[in-house]
Amino acid sequence: MNIKAIIETAVYVDDLRATETFYRTFLGLPVIGKEPGRHVFFQVGEASVLLAFLAEATLKGDLLPPHGASGPGHFALGIEAEALDGWRKLLQGHGVTVEKEVEWPRGGKSLYFRDPTGNSVELVTPGVWGLPSGW
């Protein structure tokens, strides 16, 4: 009996429209679910979902238990190594500041930037953590 994967990751945002524009239009993630005033969900790869919730909308329980966070969160999206330069140029071309670029001791590289709410988004190439990429 083993856990196989992380299926979904939640981030908490303050503007769903700006969040949808950023992730759908800019990063190219397809929208797979949306409830105005509550959330927008994006497909990431073949088997993962990024859940973007309005923070205050998740504090009251309904179908799901209450959840949420305050302050910026962090998550990483996997990219191919040869796409790193293209992503850097795309980010900079859209006025998105690359906060940090890291070459990891075990292998792989990361670019860090912020979404419209201030969440830390990382684009990471295979080799980080010494694990196979899986993408």
Where are these regions (language model features)?
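A short, sequence-level motif marking secondary-structure junctions
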Residues: 54-59, 127-129
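Short, conserved charged micro-motifs
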Residues: 18, 82-87
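Short beta-strand/turn micro-motifs at beta-sheet edges
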Residues: 61-65
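Vicinal oxygen chelate
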Residues: 2, 88-135
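Exposed loop/turn and edge beta-strand positions of beta-sandwich/beta-sheet ligand-binding modules
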Residues: 36, 73, 107
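Core segments of cupin and vicinal oxygen chelate
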Residues: 12-57
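Short glycine/proline- and charge-enriched loop/turn segments
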Residues: 67-70
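N-terminal beta-strand motif that seeds the catalytic metal site of vicinal oxygen chelate
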Residues: 1-17, 72-77, 127-135
